[in-house]
Amino acid sequence: MNIQMAVLCDAVMVENEKLSLLGAFDTIITQQLPSPQRPAIHPQCAVAVRVTFSSGDEGPHQLEIKLINADGHGITPDFPPIPFKVELPEDLHFVTRNFTAIIQQLQFPEAGLYSVDIRFDGVSRASIPLLVKHATPGETK
């Protein structure tokens, strides 16, 4: 298993096995200082993961996407696991799969460092860092 890419972006589309991304980012700047009573809310984003599998990876697997804070605690209810099966035809040496998840109304109870943890079969294989910060005067993103 080779993770070619794991990214947080504004939008993602898969058509004819081609992965298209729009607006990859790693920082969210909020206009109000978030708190547990008034969390910062990001209206919509997407996670895109592209993975190449070889013959040793054949069989059933499960992908999990978890959003965690700097202390390692989840910030949202767990997304349902994505079960999938890897099968390679005899004439292929590898197969590539695209996985996407759309996240709406993502809430951040405080400014700070977060990450999107990508797990296959319960093992963390990639981590996408995400910084949530309060805007300074004149700053937007």
Language-model region placement:
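Contiguous segments within soluble domain cores/interaction surfaces
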Residues: 2-109, 115-120, 124-141
